[in-house]
Structures are given as structure tokens and as C-alpha cells.
Amino acid sequence: MSYRRKSWLEKLADKKCLPKTLRLEKGFPCYNAVHKMGAEVGDKVVLVNPSEVVEVMKMVPEGRLITIVEICRKIARKHRVKACCTLTTGIFIMVAANAAEEASKQGGNLNIPYWRTLKAGGFLNEKYPGGVGSHKKLLEKEGFKIIRKGGKLAVSDYEKYLVHV
């Protein structure tokens, strides 16, 4: 029996096991990131479905930005927990971006302005379709200035453009 790789659109489908709330442990892969956001061992952390992440991504209008940190904070508030797993959220952001491009190539439109979603610190996402080069072009098309921070690309003064969701 041969294996067929799932499409990005298939990967974007909600999972039956999510959302799920867990108590934060030091061994969690997202521990360091959620700890930086204020969560402590024993605090409740939510893992959500891709649709919840996409819902927040779609709220960002042209000329505005959001980072994974703001997305996680909004989702955590919605679920009345201390934090949202940044690892699964980051994966779903990347899946949403690739699914949007896949749909576009098939003549569809998911209306996900994924390029307005940045990594923490305003950095561009190398896992978006076309890598940071394409991400940079899409952001510059909307008037954002891209700078080099260390060895990575970021939006200059990204904090000024953050949408409050």
C-alpha cells in the first residue's frame, strides 16, 4: 500500500482531539516560550485547532500586523487559560500560509492574509511559501520596511503596526 502525502488544505482541517487543555510542565516543547509569556508550571495551557488560529489571522487588516505572541494571548483569553501552546500555534500558522497558497494555485481563495502574521519579535517566517524572500515582497507591497536584525529579516518598528485583537 502506498502512502499519499496530505495536502496543505487537508492538514488545515480541525483535529478531533483538539482543543485540549493541559497543565504546563517543564518538559513541554513549548515550555520556554509560554514561560516567557508569563505561564508557570501547573498553569493551564490550551492546544487549539487550526481554525481558531486562522480566525485570528483573518482579523488583521491591510497595513496592520500580528505576531504569534498576540495570537496566543487572544486564544488563551478566549479559553480562559494562562497560555496557548506556541508550538502547535506556530505549526498551524505555517500550515495556513501554505494552504492559502495551495488554494490560490487551484483557483480558490481562503482569504488568509498570512504574510501579516510575524514570528515573535517581528521576524519574517522562513517557513511561509517562497521563504523569507516572498514574505518580504508581500510585506513591502503593503508598505512595510524590512530590516536585518542579526542574521534575520524583520519588520522595522513592527510594534507600531500591531493589531489589538
Where are these regions (language model features)?
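Nucleic acid-binding interface residues in structured DNA/RNA-binding domains
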Residues: 2-165
